[in-house]
Amino acid sequence: MESIRIGVLGLTNAGKSTLVNQLHKANNLLVSPMNNTTLLAVSTNTITHEKQNITFIDVPGFSEKRHSSYELISQEIRKALSGIDVLLLVVRSDQQQKLPLLQTQLQPLKRYRDLTRVLLINNFFDVVLQAEDKQAIVLDFKPQAVLETDLLHFDATSFWNQFNEVKLQANEFRKDVEFLDADTDNFKILEALREQIIKYCSEEIPHVVRLEIVDKSFDQAKNLLKLHLSISVPKLSQKKIIIGRNAQMVKKIGMQMRQKLLEYYDCNVFVELFVRTYDPKQKKSPYGSLI
């Protein structure tokens, strides 16, 4: 059976992670109104469809150069493009003000001529993408097919019916790229922690924070999963924000993270968090123990 990797790309907050979650009927990928929630390209479980094994790769959204994680995100996008067969571009219909950025980002994609290209228009809140904007994107992107959906009221059957019209082809030049696996325990643990940092801390911190599993063990007699995790940030001021007055913030983050993990695991969970600083000159992965 042929294996196809589909990279889901687009502007930040276009609905890329939401689409992949909907197709898997799961919430493994973190979704947030914050820009660039996804920092690394993430692989998901394989879906068997029409005699093909399809793996969706959730790719970080296009960002502007002034973004603190611009270099990391750009690197991840390039890595993803070299390791996929199909490029699925998601465009949200109400993001007209971001279309100039999108069209700028589409120019470098022209060199990836061997990828099957599909344009998916997310009709957000039933807002229709203006005809001239749609035409401009089609001219730049040159998709083999244009699909439309509303991810807030997603109909998987309708999506697959449209998708069946696309002739998916393996890319003979695809590299054997290794992506983060969204279905592993370690990824779920670190994403649960990152979700709380996004929820409770300023927008600057989630993009520079580096997370690591220092120790993980299971006490079978007590049915207890013990987690010791490290949160690293480049500035002392950011460390103080995460810790909070009388350590109230880091306690809240740990408690809410534990509640999230209880949805995954049929056992008790103990979480201990350490907050430290790292030298910003050192290039550290957002998920130190997974790379």
From Swiss-Prot:
Residues 201-279 form the KH type-2 domain. Residues 2-144 form the Era-type G domain. It is found in: Cytoplasm; Cell membrane. Its main location: cytoplasm. GTP binds at G10, L11, T12, N13, A14, G15, K16, S17, D58, V59, P60, G61, F62. GO terms for cellular component: cytosol; plasma membrane. SUPFAM superfamilies: P-loop containing nucleoside triphosphate hydrolases (SSF52540), Prokaryotic type KH domain (KH-domain type II) (SSF54814). Pfam families: KH_2 (PF07650), MMR_HSR1 (PF01926). Keywords: Cell membrane, Cytoplasm, GTP-binding, Membrane, Nucleotide-binding, Ribosome biogenesis, RNA-binding, rRNA-binding. It is a peripheral membrane protein. One of its GO terms (molecular function) is GTP binding. One of its GO terms (biological process) is ribosomal small subunit assembly. Monomer. An essential GTPase that binds both GDP and GTP, with rapid nucleotide exchange. Plays a role in 16S rRNA processing and 30S ribosomal subunit biogenesis and possibly also in cell cycle regulation and energy metabolism. Belongs to the TRAFAC class TrmE-Era-EngA-EngB-Septin-like GTPase superfamily. Era GTPase family. This is GTPase Era. It comes from Mycoplasma pneumoniae (strain ATCC 29342 / M129 / Subtype 1) (Mycoplasmoides pneumoniae). The lineage of its organism: Bacteria, Bacillati, Mycoplasmatota, Mycoplasmoidales, Mycoplasmoidaceae.
